[in-house]
Amino acid sequence: MEKLSNIHPGEILLEEFIKPLNISAYRLSKELGIPQTRTSEIIKGHRSITADTAIRLSYYFGNSAKFWLGLQNDFDLEEEKKSKYQEFKHIKRLNEHAA
């Protein structure tokens, strides 16, 4: 079974919020009170969603900051697991040491 690719929260912001609501990145930036470069970098997957940005997005879209931080956290965990797989796979579970 093929594993799905890791989706950056910026892609979700773009595809599930900005496009369907017909909002420009410029307008979103102005409404949130953040630089347009921050919004553009998030959408392109070049920047993480910080706690500050998560709170601003939650106020604007009416969802929770935990939603946005959860997306970012899930993305970061998957990226870390992929990048350090060889290192992590050599760690033995605690119960394997006792055997």
Task: Name each model feature, range by range.
Residues 20, 31, 60:
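Residues within the alpha-helical elements of helix-turn-helix
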Residues 35, 46, 61, 72-75:
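The DNA-recognition helices of helix-turn-helix-type DNA-binding domains
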